[in-house]
């Protein structure tokens, strides 16, 4: 019997692009016919969390799969807002890996694992994004489902309209309460003010564009300091999108990330477009440098790999106590 660590390690080794045309035949259709699909957008996980919160506040059991989790893959598979346990992750993962480990990409396996888990937990609703590296429709029957367009706004009205398509009676006060409780970690999350410390999961060209747009919208006249730790496969486009926007850029080597670009190399890339570059030896040093350079109205935005971002968040949250 495989344990959590073994399943996780084997899952991480699955290569994108290894999917076979008959993958779909290997998977039983999930029989939950209350599925809410959210097509690809920067805000798809935030929309999903808001929908989950409203349904949960109305006493429904909700399974949600996310494209993004700060801590580990357990955070991508949520049942009633709680991550799947290591025991269940190992149990469901082993069933999929043992006979079919060459037939799934990593994201396919995680999604199928989530759907099997939600089915056994008797979820009333599934909330699924469709930018997971494979189409959610491969593994779930789209009998009674609806989708959020990426052009629609992320707001209470959007989520409630979407849910009303399921003929669910919503209570206004309950919706308000759910929205007040809803908070999405690591997506333009303000951790501290004066100066402003922001954590964001931007780690590629598209998400970095969104981050820059949000900074310009909310803080158009504030100086920016960026703390950046990136993977090797996405840093070039990220550098082009954000280098000129910052007054100062601090690079780091993300911890526990074998595919990360070393901070010193990332600094060299940034320096081609912006001379105000510093490479820090740790997240703590990066935050200390930013704090020294910042004025009260400075916006310090950290973005990049998930492990680095979670360490940054925990450091800032700890100093707030």
Predicted regions span which residues?
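ATP-dependent carboxylate-amine ligase catalytic core
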Residues: 20-32, 57-142, 152-153
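Glycine-rich phosphate-binding loop signature in dinucleotide/nucleotide-binding domains
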Residues: 118-124, 218-222, 290-299
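N-terminal leader/targeting and accessory segments in enzymes
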Residues: 1-61
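C-terminal helical cap/extension that packs against the catalytic core
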Residues: 196-197, 239-299
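Nucleotide phosphate-binding/pyrophosphate-handling subdomain across enzymes
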Residues: 34, 134-146, 151-248
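Glycine/aspartate-rich loop-and-adjacent alpha/beta segment that forms the canonical ThDP
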Residues: 306-321
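Residues that mark the start of a beta-strand
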Residues: 35-37, 59-61, 196, 223, ...
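Hydrophobic alpha-helical packing residues
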Residues: 51-57, 118, 270, 316
